[in-house]
Amino acid sequence: VIGAFILLIVFYLMHKNNIKPIAISRFKALKKHIILIIGSIIMIYVFESFYQILMQFLPEKFQFNDTENNKDIAKMFTHGWLVPFLFLDIVILTPFVEELIFRHLIIHELGKKLTYGLMYIVSILIFASLHCVGAKSPFEIGPYIIIASMIVFVYHKTGRNLAVTITMHTINNAVSFLIMVMGL
């Protein structure tokens, strides 16, 4: 959480002269992308459900019910006093930080030097890989590739509007957070 705050402060200080008007215009453009955001989140769940069905055909040693990353996060919910901090981290900070890193830095900034298409792929693979550090099955990367691919698709379709992907990521994480809190 502290690292996330530091990253956000550094990003703000680097862009303090022009961040406010850009952020305002990008968030104002959100309205016209609501259907895309909601549709893409629904597609994430559809693709993940289909992926889970396909996992049943793998040898048992490669199958999994939940990713190790999700199991680790679920363990944190056993301490009730942590829930407000987890909300701040999972629903608020993480979408901002991950979108700044994976969409703004990797795609937007490196895409200027290399190609945007290549950086789309790099962003997806790094995002997914970092969410699977403790994975027991190599196929645990699948759900994260699905999530990252849909976010990158939305980022591309909206003309690389970071406000849209932050919102999409926030909604996706909020749904996951509610599922964890309700113990579903």
Which residues does each predicted region cover?
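Alpha-helical transmembrane segments in multi-pass membrane proteins
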Residues: 1-18, 68-71
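Hydrophobic alpha-helical membrane segments
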Residues: 3-7, 40, 143-151
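Helical transmembrane-bundle signal
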Residues: 4-7, 45, 173-176
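Polar low-complexity intrinsically disordered regions
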Residues: 5, 9, 42, 77-78, ...
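Cytoplasmic juxtamembrane interface segments
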Residues: 10-32, 106, 163-164
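Transmembrane helix-loop junctions in multipass membrane proteins, especially transporters and channels
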Residues: 15-20, 56-64, 132-136, 160, ...
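Transmembrane helix-loop-helix hairpins at the membrane interface
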Residues: 49, 80-184
